Amino acid sequence: MGAYKLSNTCKIDIEEIYEYGIENFGLTQAQDYILGLHELFQTLGENVNSGRDASEFFPSLRRFTYKSHMIFYLQTKSGIFIVRTLNQSMDYKQHLG
């Protein structure tokens, strides 16, 4: 199983995604979306180079698309550290700076 750790800011991102999902799509769909995110986090932890280079925002940063969100992460000795999970419509530079 791929090791991953979430930044405190990413934990807030996920809470907000979950709340938005409940309000707009219902509890079941929101839960499924968050479960899918966590499954992808594990996969990325096992395959750290799966994402694309995102070093234009921060050195060694990588990104991977999940449905309508972009996951930004850094490789660690044991897997990955997930910095942010942002909606694709957001200004990444503003939220990663």
Model-predicted segments: where are they?
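Enriched for short, Lys/Arg-rich terminal
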Residues: 69-97
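Short proline/glycine- and basic residue-enriched helix-capping loop/turn segments at helix->loop/beta transitions
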Residues: 42-46
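Basic/aromatic recognition patch in beta-strand/loop cores that engages polyanionic ligands
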Residues: 49-79
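Arg/Lys-rich, positively charged N-terminal/basic patches that mediate binding to nucleic acids
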Residues: 1-32
